[in-house]
């Protein structure tokens, strides 16, 4: 029973607790936070660290700045803008923010900058990853920023930067990742970053700098001590320098030096005057072969990796207290290390940080206990190689305590090349010929430099070392390395370069041959074409002359035959007229009694005359038709002959119809005088008057002759009652003529006066007596 009571009480307590919690959560304060937001929201902007004085915006323009001023106020100190929406920026739009100290513009398309309003509080200006190209605009802006200290213009498109104004407090300038090849900066600078540009020299770089970054430039020459001293420089970054020798530096306060990835073959610490150097980085120096001098005693971090070094100077790492050596970070790696105990004396201070135990199987005690008074290691070094006509250094792997003096000799011919004293760091060329001085040079550290190796320098070289314990020597063999001739760099490989050159020569010769063949073919084709066209022109002229001659001959024959027919016709008509006139005269003297008989007889005579005249006319017309048809057949035959020969000539000589047409036009072109002369001849032959009227009866100038019936038919003639011959018309029973004559006034009158005897009745003579009814 008690258990049941306790169970019921527990259930009631749980129900009460749940109900009270629901009541609390259902209150308005449980759903709404009535406190004001610390940072108001503007579309595209946010507060950095919930501060209204540090605003970051994305993809905005000038209109959004007014909204920012209204929402966040005018007390903004840092404004960061990403993706500015215009290609121009006028800094006057920031005038409503009098406390603005930092302006950062990133990832925009800015091309132009301007402004006139002075911003007295601005200290930092950064315009990165834009498209600025004019340094003069930037230099003008410095005048409106009197307190500016830092300016960043990285990732733009400057090809030169010229701004050496003195009225500025600018201390930090970042010009990295541009295209700058010429540089002029203010003398007030203390930090300069010109990495990843196109600088080829160190002109106009201030020596008052404390930090300098000149990495990834095309520097081929390093300035000397006299031209380049940095009394205040503390950090220098010269990564990926395109230098092989000549690196030197005078910076007494330098703490950090970085020359990673440089092309240095030789490094002389006697010329690197950095007594306070703490960090030295020389990683990935794949061409480094020799080192001279020693590190400063203050160095704490050293790195030499991926080099071609075979040893280091015995005193390269300074011997100091054990505690100091434990703090030094030393990173050294090479694939050609000489495992000689005396040549490994340099590793004693940093033995624990090297891989000598692994690579050479030597302990520190073994190296330290070795007796190294004097000696030269030459037998284990092998042949030393150098590239053709590229400066190459031959190392003398010597040792001794104290450091021995090194002398170089050429084995054959036996000539002295020079000497080096490591204690005084002096190089001597005593008793050395001028020829040897031109070819060889003694470097600091005792290595022999061959200035421009060729086959004459392939020889044995003797390195003689000497100190208070005696003298020793070693012979080193030098050979030329032709591996570069087969490298994959086409422009630096003899093999691939020769192959590419041969291909280019073959290609050029091929193109020249093709050009010569095409030129020759074109010239021959042009000559053959000229000859062919000349032959065609001559043949066309000959054919045209032949055609014209034949056509003239046909025309003359046709004219003669028509003239013969016409003369025959006139003769017959004249004979009939004479016969008719003589018969008429016989009957004119008869008296009135015989008038009727005479008239009937005259009518019979007239009918006979007309019949004979019709037969003569019909014969002449048929003969003219035959002549015309024969003439047309001969003309068509001549045209067909000319056309066939023309087509044959076009196919044989491969000429176009257009060219032949031009030739024919030039040959057939005759002057108007010749045409008029021909028309006059035709008019004279056909007896056509010059004042021939037109169809409508108006008198105009004589037009050119056209084909008419006079060419193909005979003229009509009749004899009137008086016995005179006059033009007449063709009787209705006459056969049709090929071409009808044009009607004229005279022909119409003749047609009206001429009629058949049967229809008009008897024609009376004016002398005959009147007829009796």
UniProtKB/Swiss-Prot annotation:
Topological domain ranges for the Extracellular compartment: 21-493
Cysteine-cysteine disulfides: 396-463
UniProt main location, coarse: membrane
Record keywords: Disulfide bond, Glycoprotein, Immunoglobulin domain, Leucine-rich repeat, Membrane, Repeat, Signal, Transmembrane, Transmembrane helix
InterPro entries xrefs: Ig-like_dom (IPR007110), Ig-like_dom_sf (IPR036179), Ig-like_fold (IPR013783), Leu-rich_rpt (IPR001611), LRR_dom_sf (IPR032675)
Domain of life according to the entry: Eukaryota
Membrane topology, Cytoplasmic segments: 515-773
Positions annotated as LRR repeat: 52-73, 74-96, 97-120, 122-144, 145-167, 168-191, 206-230, 233-251, 252-275, 296-319
Residues carrying a glycan: 114, 204, 361, 379
Coiled coil location: none
GO cellular component: membrane
PROSITE patterns in the record: IG_LIKE (PS50835), LRR (PS51450)
Compositional bias (Low complexity): 746-763
Transmembrane feature ranges: 494-514
Compositional bias (Polar residues): 733-745
N-terminal signal peptide: 1-20
Biased amino acid composition, Basic and acidic residues: 764-773
Membrane topology term: Single-pass type I membrane protein
Compartment annotation: Membrane
Glycoprotein recorded as keyword: yes
Stretches assigned to the Ig-like domain: 349-479
Keyword ATP-binding: no
Region Disordered, annotated ranges: 725-773
Listed name of the protein: Immunoglobulin domain and leucine-rich repeat-containing protein 2
């Amino acid at each position: 029973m008690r258990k049941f009571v306790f169970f019921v009480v527990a259930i009631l307590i749980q129900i009460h607790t749940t109900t009270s919690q629901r009541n609390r959560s259902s209150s308005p304060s449980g759903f709404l936070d009535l406190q004001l937001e610390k940072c108001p929201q503007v579309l595209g902007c946010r507060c950095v660290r919930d501060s209204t004085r540090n605003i970051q915006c994305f993809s905005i323009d000038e209109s959004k700045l007014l909204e920012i001023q209204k929402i966040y106020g005018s007390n903004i100190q840092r404004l960061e803008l990403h993706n500015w929406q215009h290609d121009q920026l006028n800094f006057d739009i920031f005038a409503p923010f009098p406390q603005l100290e930092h302006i950062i513009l990133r990832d925009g398309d800015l091309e132009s900058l301007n402004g006139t309003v002075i911003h007295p509080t601005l200290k930092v200006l950064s315009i990165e990853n834009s498209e600025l190209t004019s340094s003069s605009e930037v230099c003008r802006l410095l005048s409106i920023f009197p307190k500016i200290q830092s300016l960043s213009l990285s990732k733009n498109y400057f090809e030169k930067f010229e701004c050496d104004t003195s009225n500025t407090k600018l201390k930090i300038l970042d010009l990295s990742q541009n295209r700058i090849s010429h540089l002029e900066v203010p003398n007030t600078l203390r930090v300069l970053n010109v990495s990843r540009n196109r600088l080829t020299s160190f002109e106009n770089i201030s020596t008052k700098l404390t930090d300098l970054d000149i990495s990834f430039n095309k520097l081929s020459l390093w300035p000397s001590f006299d031209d380049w001293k940095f009394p205040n420089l503390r950090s220098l970054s010269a990564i990926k320098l395109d230098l092989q020798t000549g690196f030197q530096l005078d910076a007494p306060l330098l703490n950090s030096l970085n020359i990673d990835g440089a092309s240095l073959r030789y490094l002389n610490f006697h010329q690197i005057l950095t007594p306070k150097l703490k960090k030295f980085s020389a990683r990935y120096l794949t061409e480094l072969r020799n080192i001279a001098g020693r590190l400063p005693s203050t160095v704490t971090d050293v790195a030499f990796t991926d080099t071609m070094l075979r040893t280091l100077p015995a005193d390269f790492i300074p011997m100091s207290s054990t505690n100091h050596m434990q703090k030094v970070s030393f990173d050294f790696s090479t694939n050609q290390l000489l495992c000689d105990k005396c040549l490994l004396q340099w590793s004693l201070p940093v033995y624990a940080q090297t891989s000598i135990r692994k690579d050479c199987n030597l302990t520190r005690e073994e190296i330290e206990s070795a007796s190294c008074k004097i000696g030269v290691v030459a037998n284990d070094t092998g042949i030393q190689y150098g590239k053709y006509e590229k400066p190459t250094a031959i190392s003398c792997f010597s040792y001794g305590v104290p450091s021995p003096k090194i002398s170089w000799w050429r084995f054959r011919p036996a000539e002295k090349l020079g000497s080096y004293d490591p204690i005084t760091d002096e190089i001597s060329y005593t008793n050395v010929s001028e020829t040897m001085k031109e070819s060889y040079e003694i470097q600091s550290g005792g290595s022999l430099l061959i200035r421009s190796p060729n086959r004459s320098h392939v020889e044995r070289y003797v390195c003689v070392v000497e100190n208070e314990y005696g003298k020793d020597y070693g012979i080193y063999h030098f050979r030329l390395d032709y591996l570069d001739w087969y490298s994959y760099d086409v422009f630096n490989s003899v093999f691939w370069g020769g192959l590419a050159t041969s291909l280019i020569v073959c290609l050029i010769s091929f193109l020249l041959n093709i050009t010569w063949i095409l030129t020759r073919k074109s010239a021959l084709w042009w000559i053959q074409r000229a000859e062919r066209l000349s032959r065609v022109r001559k043949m066309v002229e000959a054919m045209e002359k032949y055609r014209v001659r034949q056509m003239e001959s046909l025309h003359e024959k046709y004219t003669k035959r028509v003239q013969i027919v016409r003369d025959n016709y006139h003769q017959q008509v004249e004979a009939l007229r004479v016969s008719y006139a003589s018969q008429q005269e016989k009957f004119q003297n008869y008296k009135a009694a015989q008038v009727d008989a005479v008239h009937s007889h005259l009518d019979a005579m007239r009918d006979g005359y007309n019949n004979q005249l019709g037969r003569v006319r019909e014969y002449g017309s048929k003969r003219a038709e035959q002549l015309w048809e024969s003439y047309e057949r001969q003309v068509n035959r001549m045209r067909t002959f000319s056309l066939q020969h023309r087509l044959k000539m076009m196919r044989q000589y491969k000429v176009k119809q257009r060219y032949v047409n031009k030739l024919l036009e030039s040959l057939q072109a005759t002057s108007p005088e010749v045409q008029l002369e021909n028309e006059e001849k035709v008019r004279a032959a056909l007896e056509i008057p010059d004042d021939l009227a037109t169809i409508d009866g108006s008198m105009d100038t004589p037009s050119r002759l056209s084909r008419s019936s006079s060419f193909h038919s005979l003229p009509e003639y009749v004899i009137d009652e008086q016995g005179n011959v006059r033009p007449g018309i063709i009787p209705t029973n006459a056969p049709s003529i090929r071409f009808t004559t044009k009607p004229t006034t005279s022909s119409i009158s003749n047609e009206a006066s001429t009629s058949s005897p049967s229809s008009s009745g008897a024609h009376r003579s004016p002398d005959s007596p009147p007829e009796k009814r």
